[in-house]
Regions:
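Alpha-helical segment proximal to the catalytic Tyr-Lys
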Residues: 23-27, 88
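A conserved structural motif in NAD(P)-dependent oxidoreductases
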Residues: 64-75
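Short C-terminal tail/terminal secondary-structure segment
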Residues: 80, 91-113
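Active-site helix of classical SDR
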Residues: 10, 18
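Conserved SDR Rossmann-fold cofactor-binding beta-strand/turn motif
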Residues: 30-40, 83, 96-98
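Non-catalytic, hydrophobic alpha-helical segments
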Residues: 75-76, 82
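A glycine/serine/threonine-rich, flexible loop-to-helix segment
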Residues: 38-63, 106-113
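Active-site loop immediately N-terminal to the catalytic Tyr-X3-Lys motif
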Residues: 1-6, 67, 85
Length: 113
């Protein structure tokens, strides 16, 4: 469930790559990453779910500490912040921008999960 060991290994590999690139490219280039959670995209909301999509979305939203599913546009300001001087002290960091899913993961609710 959740993608299994290959998915998990790929996430850890990306985190390691961010840290290694941050080390190698400092001080001229800062490298940080963003780990989003569920995003409202065609890939995140497969058509195979058909008419079940609204109930699945409602169930996911109920399971999140910040109960909404963001769109890709919701991350723009975070990326701009990371590219700005406001983040000049940050490098090698992965920001969890996942509506709190990393706190406990998705838990089963009565809303469709």
């Amino acid at each position: 469930a959740g993608g299994g060991p290959i998915y998990t290994a790929s996430k850890h590999a990306i985190a390691g790559l961010v840290k290694e690139l941050a080390y190698e490219l400092a001080p001229k280039i800062r490298v940080n990453g963003v780990a989003p959670g569920v995003i409202a995209t065609a890939m995140g909301m497969p058509k195979a779910l058909g008419e079940q999509v609204p109930s699945v979305i409602a169930g996911v939203e109920q399971a999140l500490p910040l109960p909404f599913i963001p769109h890709s546009d919701d991350y723009v300001e975070l990326y701009l912040l990371l590219a700005s001087d406001a983040a000049k002290t940050m490098t090698g960091t992965i920001i969890q921008a996942d509506n709190g899913i990393s706190i406990r993961g998705l838990v089963k609710t009565s809303g469709g999960l």
